[in-house]
């Protein structure tokens, strides 16, 4: 059995405490409230001492984003795993619902991850180029479930010629699908579905639907049903 050295355990605990306090500040006051100085004060540290753990505020925000993406991914995967493994469409549907539930319950965290550009987040997301990035890990279960639906039902998609003509120069199916081998028209359907899901959830989280509906969940369920119907045709 490998025993973690005491110094390493203490450092890991301190890093976790710093990120926990950063999240508390985020929830209390949004991204501008996250401050290395405020965290150091709450921990009884000097401001320079905190730089032994994070070289900059951007680095801390990027690390916090990684934790949040992993937390959201685990939430979505739990919803997926509660459905039978041989029913990919219900699994994808429950994943979409789980994404909405987490997002609505964590508006500040959602805002940091998916909202207005914040330097640390912008830099972090710019590095999302491989499957090991937390943002890619979050998207992977959705892509896998979507691919399973496609391989099971071969749902209708726009003509490949149309997609090639309109998006051929701007889309990289292999990169988007992380090597899943999906044809370009299916990758387009995946992107279309994701932007539809994300757009509605973002409008709800940021309070932009109050002019139209008093309760967003029924609208979400109607949109989700319409999306599912497209893949069931």
Map each language-model feature to its residues.
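Basic, helix-initiating cap at the start of DNA-binding domains
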Residues: 1-29, 33-38, 42, 55-62, ...
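Long, contiguous binding/interaction regions
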Residues: 113
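Secondary-structure edge/capping motif, primarily at the C-terminal ends of alpha-helices
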Residues: 76-84, 117, 204-208
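Short hydrophobic/aromatic patch on the recognition helix
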Residues: 44-54
